[in-house]
Amino acid sequence: MATINSKIPAGPLKEKWTNYKDHQKLVNPANKRRLDIIVVGTGLAGASAAASFGEMGFNVLNFCIQDSPRRAHSIAAQGGINAAKNYQNDGDSVYRLFYDTIKGGDYRAREANVYRLAEVSNAIIDQCVAQGVPFAREYGGLLDNRSFGGAQVSRTFYARGQTGQQLLLGAYSALSRQVGLGKVKLYTRYEMLDVVLIDSRARGILARNLVTGKIERFAAHAVVIATGGYGNAFFLSTNAMASNGSAAWQCYKKGAFFANPCMAQIHPTCIPVHGDYQSKLTLMSESLRNDGRIWVPKDIEDAGRLQRGEIKGKDIPEEKRDYYLERRYPAFGNLVPRDVASRAAKERCDAGYGVNNTGLAVFLDFGDAIKRLGRDVVEQKYGNLFQMYEKIADENPYETPMMIYPAIHYTMGGLWVDYELMTTIPGLFAIGEANFSDHGANRLGASALMQGLADGYFVIPYTMQNYLADQIQVPRFSTDRPEFEAAEKELQDRITRIMNVKGNKSVDDLHKELGHIMWDNVGMGRDKAGLEKAIVKLDELKKEFWSNVYVPGEANDLNVELEKALRLADFIEIGTLMAHDAMDREESCGGHFRIEHQTEEGEAKRDDENFAYVSCWEYQGEDKDPVMYKEELVYEETVRAQRNYKS
């Protein structure tokens, strides 16, 4: 039977990370030159980790699914990155950032990991400023801050609405330096399709060259997964089209535990679905909730007129508007956490108060902000976001309210990792959104960038040394070993099987079916009947995929449809595990909302007595039910309580 050992250091919470660093094992410079590390992914987490390893003297193989690391999905992050510098002198501190993150995650995250995240947050800002990241500054030249959901302080550093882009360019510059020095070898347009184990340790990967179609083998002393989340299991999401969960999923099928798979985040401010042919959704930054006010009509008749296109939002007078977040949550108003804001929007729309032709939208209105601050100030703060909205929605948000609706955005679940960010497979690490470690049941806005850079710059450079210190006598592995041969044969057989189906349905059609199943049954509101239905339908969809998918072209060539088919096969299985996990967790917490478990006011109702744990799923084989283990969550610094954002 597997055991769960999170390796949390002993001692007071505030001293754990310092004590770890003081007593960890080290690798001297001469030995670092003999050790190889594979980093899969070149987003913020992957690029920062690869650059850090190269700077330290390790030999790094870095894999990028795009044609350049600059196209990683991290570039899409808009609003900002959190850090506890307290530049605004408004009461912020490392402890408050830690507490807000624990509370925002609905008390389903490890205290030790979250405190470390808050502790290193300030160093991230210093690092990025040193790299030249152009953070917004106040008139006097000091770095500026704004507020995000789930906090009552301004701790979010930003670069207009392009923070992810600017941070990624900083990490990319550091990575490029190491590529130029020869310490990092960068493989662009490669997709990892399997991890190779030798003597139960991660010692390499198989990756498909997406240009030639060739399967290639790569060996190393350790492997780092930094491939992001699995939100595209819902088909429509704010994720980039290439974002997928396949690398993490293949690690799961080789023995790495998958943690809290049901914890998916619905972002409250996304541009609503516009038609059946849409392939992705567009996020509108959470920063807009600083000055934008969310509302629906008070009168159902006005909602009907909006839905029929008879009037516009600006035609409804102030006294007939329901600013429902301000009404329900006066202490936080429009800056409640994402899960709370999303459920509130869904409740209003389900009650018939939606404001577009589908009834699935609410208003995000800047009329008051423009009156208070002036259009020039609003344009300076949010201009590029307003331009993006106008191009997509064909409406001027300076003159008429934006329309928004929740959409899948981020996954808090991922590969289980211990305090050192290592999975249950020795030598296999997971960082950034690919792991589960820091956000519990709900991530606070502006904390994804914080975690990615914390893991890559300030955590794994220490913990990787601690692991590799015992590997310095291990010689480099040949990719001709039987373990690589067997893994490649299994992968080639899988690809051949997909290519030989020659069915009647396209990959996109089947992916849309998956999306409907997931959104309708494993989305914002979940119940036993819906989850049971999802499990049955997902099993049927899996059978249809393997009997009726059509993939044109050749396997040994550039073939985008084959890429999508391989990912979809994994998404179907990921969706099934998500449904099982959601079924097992008989409580509501954060992004996991079981309709049977809510308060009289419709808020999430946790069950700390029975479900204060991380669910850790172990793969048992094809068509066999996975086994779930529990990592019990112990809270020594915080007192668990039902979240209250009303006072």
Language model segments and positions:
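Glycine-rich loop(s) and the adjacent beta-strand/alpha-helix scaffold that form part
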Residues: 222-281, 439-462
